[in-house]
Amino acid sequence: MANHHRLLRGGGSPAIIGGRITLTAFASTIALFLFTLSFFFASDSNDSPDLLLPGVEYSNGVGSRRSMLDIKSDPLKPRLIQIRKQADDHRSLALAYASYARKLKLENSKLVRIFADLSRNYTDLINKPTYRALYDSDGASIEESVLRQFEKEVKERIKMTRQVIAEAKESFDNQLKIQKLKDTIFAVNEQLTNAKKQGAFSSLIAAKSIPKGLHCLAMRLMEERIAHPEKYTDEGKDRPRELEDPNLYHYAIFSDNVIAASVVVNSAVKNAKEPWKHVFHVVTDKMNLGAMQVMFKLKEYKGAHVEVKAVEDYTFLNSSYVPVLKQLESANLQKFYFENKLENATKDTTNMKFRNPKYLSILNHLRFYLPEMYPKLHRILFLDDDVVVQKDLTGLWEIDMDGKVNGAVETCFGSFHRYAQYMNFSHPLIKEKFNPKACAWAYGMNFFDLDAWRREKCTEEYHYWQNLNENRALWKLGTLPPGLITFYSTTKPLDKSWHVLGLGYNPSISMDEIRNAAVVHFNGNMKPWLDIAMNQFRPLWTKHVDYDLEFVQACNFGL
C-alpha cells in the first residue's frame, strides 16, 4: 500500500503516463508534417504550380487563391522548350567538332575558330536577357513576338552551323573518309589497270620485235652464205649416219632466231661429258636457213653433230595434213593475230598474249610431229630456243619412262597452273574428258619416248583436238593447251631441278634454284636477247654467245 501511494505521488498511474506519451508523439508528428509543408510552400516560384495546395494563402508573393483547374501551362511553352533544345544540341555538336579538329591537329586552324565562335554564338544567344526571361518565366506570359525573334535567330545559326559542318564533315566523318578512300583506291586501280594493259601491250610489241643487232647478224650471215655457197652447202654430200643413230643423244631445236639457237647448242655442248655423242637437229624456216647454216659452220662443237634443215624440207607438213596450216588460211584467224591496234588489244587483255603470230608459225607446232620427222629415233629431247643448258643432260636417257610418252616438269602449285586455266571447261567435250584440277606441265625441255608416241598415236590425237578448236572454243590457241590434251595421261613428271622456268618474267627466282637447275628457261616476254631482259639473269645467257665471231662483233650485238 505504501508503495502504491509513492507511485501516485511520483507521477500518477500507468494509464495516465501512457496517455501522456501518446499525446506527445502525436503532437510531434503534426509538428513534423507542418514543417515539411512549410518547406515546400517556401520553395522558389519556379517550382511546378501543381505542388501548391488549393485554398491556402501563402506568403511567397503569389498571394492568390488557385484551384488545380485554374493553373494551366502556356501553349507556347513546348515550342520554347523545343527551340531551346535544338540550340543546345547544335551548340554541343559545334563543341564536339571543335574538339575533333583540335585532336586531329588540322592544318587549317580556321575551322577550330569557326566552330568555337559558333558555340559562343549559341551561348550568347541563349543567355541573352530577353530570351532567357522567356525560358525562366512561369509560362504564363510568353510574348509570341519575342519567341518568334528567338526562333528566327536560332534557325539562322543552325543553318550556318550545318553549312560549316557540311563543308568540314569529310575531315571528321569516318564513313565519308572511308568512302573517299574507296573512291581514291578505285581510281588508282583503274589507272593501274590501264597502265598494266599499256605495259602488257608494249611488252608484247617488244617481244615480237627483232633487235637491230639480231637482224644485222642474220643479214650478214646470209650475205656470207650467198657469197660463198660452196663452203656452207651439204648438197652432194652423204648424210652422216650419226644423225639417225638411235644410240646417240638427240636434241630437237626449232627456231628462226640464229643467236638463240646457237646459245642452246653452245651451252649443251659445253656441259656435255661426251659431246661427240650428242646430235642437234636444228630446224628453221626457209628465210633463215642460210644464216643458220653459216652460223653452225663457223666453229666446231667438240665433236658434236649439228644438222640444220628448213621446215619446207619436210614435205608431209602441208595444209592438207597439218590443221594449223589449214586454219592459217582463215580470214578470222588472221585478223585475230595480225590486227594489233592498241585500242583493240588492250580491250582483250586476257587473250593479248595469244595474239603473237608465233603461235601460227609451223615452227611452233613441229613438236607434235617428232616421230615422223625422225622415224629412226627412239628417244629425243626437245629444247626451246630460249633455254640455257647448265648440266650434262644424258641422265634423262636413263630415266624409266614407265611407258609414258612425255617427260616434263610439272608447274602446278596450289590452284595455279591447273588444266582449268588453259582450257574452256564450260565446253562439254573438255568437261567430259579432262579433270580441271589436273596438274599442268611446261614446254621448253621435254623428253619424248618416240616409240611410245607412235604406239599411243599422239599425233592423231593432236589433230583430232586441233580440228575441233578451229573457232578457238576449246582453248585460246598456243601450243601448251593442245600439248596438255594430247599427253593428258601419257606424261611422266620429272624432278623440278631438271627444268627451272620463269627467267623471262619472274625476278624472284632464287639463285640457288637456278644454280641447281640442269636447264633454265627464259619463258616470258623478257627474252635475254632483248633490251627488256632482267639484268640479274641475262649473264646466264650472254656467257654462251660467240662474241669472238666477226659477224657478231660487226653487228655490235648485245651493246
Curated annotation (Swiss-Prot):
Location in the cell: Golgi apparatus membrane
Q: Give, as in the UniProt entry, the pathway in which the protein acts.
A: Glycan metabolism; pectin biosynthesis
Q: Which UniProt keywords apply?
A: Cell adhesion, Cell wall biogenesis/degradation, Glycoprotein, Glycosyltransferase, Golgi apparatus, Membrane, Signal-anchor, Transferase, Transmembrane, Transmembrane helix
State the InterPro entries in the record: GAUT, Glyco_trans_8, Nucleotide-diphossugar_trans
Q: What is its EC number?
A: 2.4.1.-
One BP term from GO:
homogalacturonan biosynthetic process
Residue spans, topological domain Lumenal: 42-559
Q: TM spans, by residue? A: 21-41
PANTHER family documented for this protein: GALACTURONOSYLTRANSFERASE 4-RELATED, GALACTURONOSYLTRANSFERASE 8
Q: Which family does it belong to?
A: Belongs to the glycosyltransferase 8 family.
What function is annotated for this protein? Alpha-1-4-D-galacturonosyltransferase involved in homogalacturonan (HGA) synthesis, a class of pectin which plays a role in cell adhesion.
Q: What is the protein name given in its UniProt record?
A: Galacturonosyltransferase 8
- In the UniProt record, what gene is named as encoding this protein? GAUT8
